[in-house]
Amino acid sequence: MKTLNFKHAIEKLGYKVEKYVYGYNFRSAFASKDNQLWYFHIEDLRDEHPFVYRRKVKSLEDYTGGSNNNDVELKLEQLGYKIVEKRKQKYDFNSF
């Protein structure tokens, strides 16, 4: 199975990344597809298998949006990909 980072995984599913947040232990993105805006989030990267979800949103500032869908990894798996996202190593105060 081929590996992709979080941002490239979203693009591989046919979305255009509009806004990307690269946090210490998480990543999130707003992306569009077929005139619909979506919010993607990969949870705590300190975990061996972090949780990935997406939901429909109304704007690039809508962090509450609709219901979470956890089908991102399954859709990628069907295409022969999996997400491998490394944490920031420098200044990661949560890892002490």
Put a short name on every predicted segment.
Residues 3, 64-67, 86:
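Residue-identity detector for threonine
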Residues 9-13, 75-82:
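Charge-rich, solvent-exposed alpha-helical interaction surfaces
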Residues 1-24:
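Negatively charged, low-complexity tracts enriched in Asp/Glu with abundant Ser/Thr
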Residues 87-96:
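Short acidic DE-rich linear segments
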Residues 19-78:
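Acidic, low-complexity, intrinsically disordered interaction modules
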Residues 19-20, 83-86:
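Short, surface-exposed acidic
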